[in-house]
Structures are given as C-alpha cells and as structure tokens.
C-alpha cells in the first residue's frame, strides 16, 4: 500500500497509468463491455464503480489539452435513451479532483468499440450504469 493512492487503484492499474504516455487513452468500461474481445491489455476492477476509479485516477492523471475532447462516452443507440446523471456524476467527480472539467464528446457504439481497440488498456469495472463507459486521454504531466 502506498500513501496517497486511492484504494480503488490496484497495483496493475497504477503500473498502467505510469506507463501511459501523452496521447494514450484508457477505457474505463462497465461490467458488460466486451473488453477481452476488443483488447489484449485488460485490467479487472470488479465491484468498483467508474466514479470510484475516477476519484482515484484523476489526481494522478493529466488530461490532454491538445485535443478537443479528452473524455469520450458512448452515445445511446437509436431508439434507446441514456441517463444524463451518469455523465454529470463523472464530470462532477473529475471537477472535484482537479477543479475543472475537460470537454466530453460522445460517439456511437461501434465507433467507441473501434476507439477502444486503439486504447493503451481497458479497465473492466463493476459499473452497471447504462452507457457508463468512458475513455480518458492522457496529456503531458507538467514539471513542477
């Protein structure tokens, strides 16, 4: 155990966060996401919500400022609806940790799957919120 590291951040996830370079993306997926079909680098965070992971990741993670939207979520499939409270809770969690909210974009389901294939890794969570998947893009960590 390390001081200052949120308990939702496993050693495997901490290693991935450290390995990621600027421009790399991390998928935080819900419990139903086809992660193993889409990607070879999968970390399990069973029973842990995406909000809890965002609480732990955000203080360690610089969001990309060179892209229009460093946050990406899946848009609802035609004829379906999504709960805007899911997005709002994620954005509030990020804002609480870093003081601002990066821009978020949405893409259709299959475009999201294709984007996930290109990510650095996928984290399967215990999240059950419909359309709860989110991709976060890492930026350049400032030197202090």
Swiss-Prot record:
The keyword Cytoplasm applies. The lineage of its organism: Bacteria, Pseudomonadati, Pseudomonadota, Gammaproteobacteria, Pasteurellales. Substrate binds at residues 30, 109, 131-133. Pfam families: RbsD_FucU. SUPFAM superfamilies: RbsD-like (SSF102546). This is L-fucose mutarotase. Involved in the anomeric conversion of L-fucose. The active site is at 22 (proton donor). Its main location: cytoplasm. One of its GO terms (biological process) is fucosylation. Pathway: Carbohydrate metabolism; L-fucose metabolism. Its EC number is 5.1.3.29.
């Amino acid at each position: 155990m390390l001081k200052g590291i949120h308990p939702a951040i496993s050693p495997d996830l901490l290693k991935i966060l450290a390995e990621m370079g600027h421009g790399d993306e991390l998928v935080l997926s819900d419990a139903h996401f086809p992660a193993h079909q889409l990607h070879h680098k999968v970390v399990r965070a069973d029973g842990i919500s995406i909000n809890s992971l965002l609480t732990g990741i955000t203080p360690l993670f610089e969001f990309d400022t060179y892209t229009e939207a460093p946050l990406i979520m899946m848009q609802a499939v035609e004829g379906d609806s999504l709960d805007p409270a899911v997005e709002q809770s994620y954005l509030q969690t990020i804002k609480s940790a870093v003081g601002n909210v990066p821009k978020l974009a949405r893409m259709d389901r299959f475009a999201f799957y294709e984007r996930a294939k290109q990510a650095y890794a996928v984290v399967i969570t215990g999240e059950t919120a419909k359309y709860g998947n989110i991709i976060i893009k890492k930026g350049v960590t400032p030197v202090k």
